[in-house]
């Protein structure tokens, strides 16, 4: 089987990694598999360049088959991939398989497991540590004052969209600036994660800690450009917040 046909899923993705270059960037250095190294597959995967967004999923989470419900239908060579992730596979037992294919399936499977893991209490805590350290980067918008961002997906299905970065200050999505992250699938983080994260860790929400919700106001010779103008500002309400939502809710209840 050729490298360009490595990823073959049961659904019909709109975005696939169909070229050799794309496959090489996403699944780099397959030949350096941990099968012959004194390191777990999970640690090896997360330590590779470009995998900084990922956390190490606990093996007991993966061994609980309830957490893997339905993934056998989404990943080819599911059993072999799962054995590889859990280091239950010896090199000589895979002689009849194309190791590139098994490695690719294992990485897809791990990504989908990762999506489910990071919305658990333990997974959220691990991601919170990375977020606090700024591992995921900062918002490129000037008025967001270097607010830390979180990885997010637009879909929970593999192959739909690459990973994006969600800014909790301007509530917008941005593509990663580094090319090493452009082929990470968005489903490996999912659409739920960033919003559940800030519900679980409200103290990390920048809207509650730093006053950086500025909105750019276009001006000509010092005068504000009207919103009715063709070149005027658009949809500024998207970045406007209530000063004290708590007091508003109390007044409504009265």
UniProtKB/Swiss-Prot annotation:
Example GO biological process: signal transduction
Keywords recorded for this protein, A-Z: Phosphoprotein
Gene Ontology terms: cellular component: cytoplasm; nucleus; protein kinase CK2 complex; UTP-C complex
Post-translational modification: Phosphorylated by alpha subunit.
Entry-linked InterPro entries: Casein_kin_II_reg-sub_N (IPR016149), Casein_kinase_II_beta-like (IPR035991), Casein_kinase_II_reg-sub (IPR000704)
Entries under Gene3D superfamilies matching the protein: 2.20.25.20, protein kinase ck2 holoenzyme, chain C, domain 1
A GO term, aspect molecular function: protein serine/threonine kinase inhibitor activity
Stated family: Belongs to the casein kinase 2 subunit beta family.
The protein's role, per its UniProt record: Regulatory subunit of casein kinase II/CK2. As part of the kinase complex regulates the basal catalytic activity of the alpha subunit a constitutively active serine/threonine-protein kinase that phosphorylates a large number of substrates containing acidic residues C-terminal to the phosphorylated serine or threonine.
Subunit structure, interactors included: Tetramer composed of two alpha chains, one beta chain and one beta' chain.
Protein name, per record: Casein kinase II subunit beta-2
Organism in which the protein naturally occurs: Schizosaccharomyces pombe (strain 972 / ATCC 24843) (Fission yeast)
């Amino acid at each position: 089987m050729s490298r360009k046909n490595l990823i073959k899923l049961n659904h019909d993705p709109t975005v696939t990694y169909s070229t050799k270059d794309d496959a090489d960037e996403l699944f780099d250095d397959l030949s350096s598999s941990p099968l012959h190294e004194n390191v777990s597959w999970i640690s090896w995967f997360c330590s590779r360049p470009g995998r900084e967004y990922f956390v190490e999923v606990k093996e007991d989470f993966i061994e609980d088959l309830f957490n893997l419900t339905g993934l056998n239908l989404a990943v080819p060579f599911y059993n072999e991939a799962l054995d590889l992730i859990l280091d239950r596979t010896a090199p000589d037992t895979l002689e009849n398989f194309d190791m590139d294919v098994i490695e690719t399936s294992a990485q897809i499977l791990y990504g989908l497991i990762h999506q489910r893991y990071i919305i658990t209490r333990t997974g959220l805590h691990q991601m919170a540590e990375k977020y606090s350290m700024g591992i995921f980067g900062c918002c490129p918008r000037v008025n967001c004052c270097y607010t830390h961002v979180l990885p997010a997906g637009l879909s929970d299905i593999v192959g739909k969209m690459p990973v994006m970065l969600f800014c909790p200050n301007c509530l917008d999505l941005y593509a990663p600036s580094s090319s090493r992250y452009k082929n990470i699938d968005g489903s490996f983080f999912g659409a739920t994660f960033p919003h559940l994260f800030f519900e679980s860790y409200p103290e990390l929400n920048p809207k509650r800690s730093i006053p950086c919700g500025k909105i750019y106001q276009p001006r000509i010779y010092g005068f504000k450009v009207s919103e009715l103008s063709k070149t005027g500002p658009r949809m500024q309400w998207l970045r406007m917040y209530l000063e004290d939502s708590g007091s508003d809710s109390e007044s409504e209840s009265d």
